[in-house]
A protein has these predicted regions:
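Glycine-biased, small-residue-rich flexible motifs in mid-sequence functional cores and linkers
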Residues: 1-36, 41-44, 132, 141, ...
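Short, small/acidic-rich helices and loops at N termini and domain boundaries
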Residues: 1-151
Length: 380
């Protein structure tokens, strides 16, 4: 994987392709997955402006149509062609905004114009416009599976991120491991919390995740130290006990490209997850996990879940951001109570006191969290 990582990163920074000479094959491509990979690269993950553009497309392959519209602007050789292509692009955005339930005001159109210029600039910096080469580049030479809307492995719950026009669902998901883990359970449980935890929090997260997976349910978390790692290890423990046919899976959601998974102290965990579970990101390979991306990642952890559990959290923990997303999307939110004299539990205690979350009173009796026991829906 190290060699693939370096190769992918370096290729993205080589000399740009010449659009008017080499974009023809890409313009003719009807590969929706490739189009969404490139649109994700252009917009640096999902945002509301790109989603409006996609909603303004009328074809069965909105990603392909949106990419072609951007390429037509990039390839225009005369002022008239440029004006016509930009007008088409803006009309798609305005239509998509209306379909999303809003009116495209002048400031919104201006924001789209600036954003689309950046997107086109990133397209022009691609090292090639050859579809096969781009597909190899953006899948880490085949190391990652790309899942898009319409795929049998696309979690339908992500569409709840579409209910407000200032949110945006991911354009695609990059998966390393078993992509079927994403849809292996109808009502997944997300377990989140602080990185710096005590033994109580670690025990609660691991035991709760193990019990959840022992009943065939999917456990979702963020791959970080502390509560996240404990939750993933708990799900792995369940598989060691019951085997792959019965135990539920675990999915780790990352804030950057899958070639930038961290922390390094969790590498053994990540290797285990890749066997029969899944590492997932909405970002293209080589994307650096900047601080703002962790907050965006939290919305995916909440959206994937039927129930969200905050196992242990301080008042300023990022897990409270995930809890906020969960409440916005009407997920069932639970918090584990702790000592009122310990700052490590203050976030959970506040959620319970403010009636933002239900109190979770047991890690062994999970009936209040999960539906009936089932075998995971996975490929043979």
């Amino acid at each position: 994987m190290t060699a693939l990582t370096h190769q992918t990163t370096s290729q993205l920074h080589t000399a740009p392709a010449q659009p008017t000479l080499s974009a023809k094959a890409l313009l003719q491509s009807d590969d929706e997955a490739l189009a969404r990979m490139l649109l994700t690269h252009c917009s640096e993950c999902a945002n509301a402006l790109m989603t409006s553009l996609l909603k303004g497309c009328d074809s069965e392959h909105p990603g392909v149509e949106a990419l072609r519209a951007l390429l037509m602007v990039a390839c225009a050789t005369t002022e008239q062609e440029q004006r016509r292509a930009r007008n088409t692009l803006e009309c798609m955005f305005i239509l998509g905004t209306a379909r999303w339930g809003r009116k495209a005001r002048s400031e919104g159109v201006a924001s789209f114009q600036l954003a689309s210029q950046r997107w086109i600039g990133r397209l022009l910096q691609l090292p090639t416009f050859d579809p096969d080469a781009l597909c190899a580049l953006f899948t880490g030479q085949g190391a990652y599976t790309v899942v898009i809307p319409g795929s049998p492995y696309w979690p339908e719950s992500l569409e709840d991120l579409d209910v407000r026009s200032d949110w945006a669902p991911p354009l695609a998901l990059w998966v390393q491991g078993d992509a079927t883990a994403l849809t292996s359970c109808d009502r997944p449980v997300s377990i989140v919390g602080s990185r710096g935890v005590n033994e109580y929090g670690r025990h609660v997260a691991r035991n709760l995740a193990c019990q959840t997976a022992l009943n065939g349910h999917l456990v979702v978390s963020g791959g970080a130290m502390g509560i996240d790692a404990a939750a993933h290890w708990g799900a792995l423990e369940a598989m060691n006990q019951l085997g792959a046919k019965v135990a539920g899976r675990t999915v780790a959601i990352f804030a950057g490209g899958l070639d930038h998974c961290g922390p390094t102290t969790n590498m053994r965990l990540f290797e285990q997850i890749c066997t029969r579970h899944a590492r997932v990101s909405e970002c293209t390979p080589s994307t650096i996990p900047e601080p703002r991306r962790f907050l965006l990642r939290n919305r995916l952890i909440a959206a994937l879940a039927y129930s969200v559990v905050v196992a242990q959290a301080r008042l300023r923990s990022g897990a409270l951001n995930t809890a906020g997303w969960a409440n916005e999307m009407n997920r069932r939110l639970f918090a584990v109570p702790g000592e009122i004299t310990t700052p490590a539990h203050a976030g959970c205690n506040r959620l319970i006191a403010d009636q933002q979350a239900s109190l979770l009173s047991s890690t062994s009796d999970i009936e209040q969290l999960c539906h009936e026991t089932h075998a995971p829906s996975i490929r043979p």
